Amino acid sequence: MQNLHDDSIDILAIETAASTKDDREVIEKKIELIKQIRERERFNKIELYDPYPFQVKFHGTGIDCNQRLLMAGNRTGKTQSGACETAIHALGGDHYPSWWSGRRFDKPTVCFVGGHSTESVRDISQEALLGTPGDPDAAGTGMIPRDRIIKTERKPGVPNAVSVVMVRHASGGTSYIY
């Protein structure tokens, strides 16, 4: 059985296993559904965010604290937490998950994302929010769904970096991420 997230489906092996035309038709429909699920997951990563308890606690502290620090070990989800929270606030509305106890924004937001250098912001934060920098096919594979990205503007002098992202907020307005 192939992993649902594997990029390849061995169609020949599946067709060989199908003994009748009806079996093949059922299998072809299932393959098409798997492709649709993959496409939805690829461009809606925010829906797949399943935070650890420390991340839930971090997001919840936003109700009382305007400034927070998430300090944790390497590869534990700090970037994912920040990207998710930034995306959720930029999107608003029903993008706030049921477990969310932090601050909610009914109107579009303005957010600033920073890092050690423009290159590190591009390679880490921008990728987490938008998808792989410089790959047009990857636009929308980060935490902000493709269909909600209104426009991005390039940052002069830094290849594949953006200076601003405009996101359609649930209220109908535009959120800005700098």
Question: Which sequence ranges carry the predicted segments?
Answer:
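Phosphate/NTP-binding elements of NTP-utilizing enzymes
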Residues: 1-178
